[in-house]
Amino acid sequence: MSRYTGPSWKQSRRLGLSLTGTGKELARRNYVPGQHGPNNRSKLSEYGLQLAEKQKLRFSYGLGEKQFRNLFVQATKIKEGTLGFNFMILLERRLDNVVYRLGLATTRRQARQFVNHGHILVDGKRVDIPSYRVEPGQVISVREKSMKVPAILEAVEATLGRPAFVSFDAEKLEGSLTRLPERDEINPEINEALVVEFYNKML
C-alpha cells in the first residue's frame, strides 16, 4: 500500500483525527465524508477498531503501510519498555517528524518535502532521508542557502508553541530533540495497544 497523497481534509474526517495539525478540518464537519456522514453510527468490530486505530496513527505520520509495518517490526526488537510506546518513539525520532516538531514545517508532509529537497542539516551535514533516526542532542538546522525559503520562514512564524522535549533557536533556525518524549506528550488521542493487537495478528 502506497503513501496516501489525497485530500487530507477528507481523510482527517474519515479518521476523526486532524492530519494537518490545525483541527480546522474537524471544526465544521466532525463526521465522516459522504452523503450519510452525519448519520453514520455503525459500530466497528474488534478488528475494525484495531484497523481504524492503526490507520489513524499511520496517516498521522504520513507513512505507507510497508514502511509503517517495518518500523513496528523494529520496535518488537527493543527489549526495554512497552512495544506500543517504543513504536511511537521510533515514529517520533524520524527526521521529518522532528523537523515538524521544531516548527520548521506546518505539517509532516511539508517537513518531508523540506528534507527530500535538501533543506535540512543534521549536525551540519545535509540529510535528505525523511526516515533518518534522530538521536537526542543532534542539531537539526536549515541549510544556509535555504534560510530564506518563504515556506520555512512562514512555518516558524506560525508556530505558537513547541513540545517540551525539543529546543529551538528561531534566529539560527536550528534546534534539537533534547530528550525522548513521555507518553502523555505525544498523540494522546491514539490507543497504541489497539495498533499492537492489530499487528500481533498480522505478523
Swiss-Prot record:
All residue ranges annotated as the S4 RNA-binding domain in the record: 93-156
GO BP term, pick one: ribosomal small subunit biogenesis
A Pfam family: Ribosomal_S4
Alphabetic keyword roster: Ribonucleoprotein, Ribosomal protein, RNA-binding, rRNA-binding
Keyword Ribosomal protein: yes
InterPro entries from the UniProt entry: Ribosomal_uS4, Ribosomal_uS4_bac-type, Ribosomal_uS4_CS, Ribosomal_uS4_N, S4_RNA-bd, S4_RNA-bd_sf
GO MF terms held by the record: rRNA binding; structural constituent of ribosome
GO cellular component: small ribosomal subunit
SUPFAM superfamilies the UniProt entry points to: Alpha-L RNA-binding motif
HAMAP family: Ribosomal_uS4_B
PANTHER family (alphabetical): 30S 40S RIBOSOMAL PROTEIN (PTHR11831), SMALL RIBOSOMAL SUBUNIT PROTEIN US4M (PTHR11831:SF4)
Subunit structure: Part of the 30S ribosomal subunit. Contacts protein S5. The interaction surface between S4 and S5 is involved in control of translational fidelity.
Family: Belongs to the universal ribosomal protein uS4 family.
Function: One of the primary rRNA binding proteins, it binds directly to 16S rRNA where it nucleates assembly of the body of the 30S subunit.
Protein name, UniProt field: Small ribosomal subunit protein uS4
Organism from which the protein derives: Streptococcus uberis (strain ATCC BAA-854 / 0140J)
Encoding gene, per UniProt annotation: rpsD
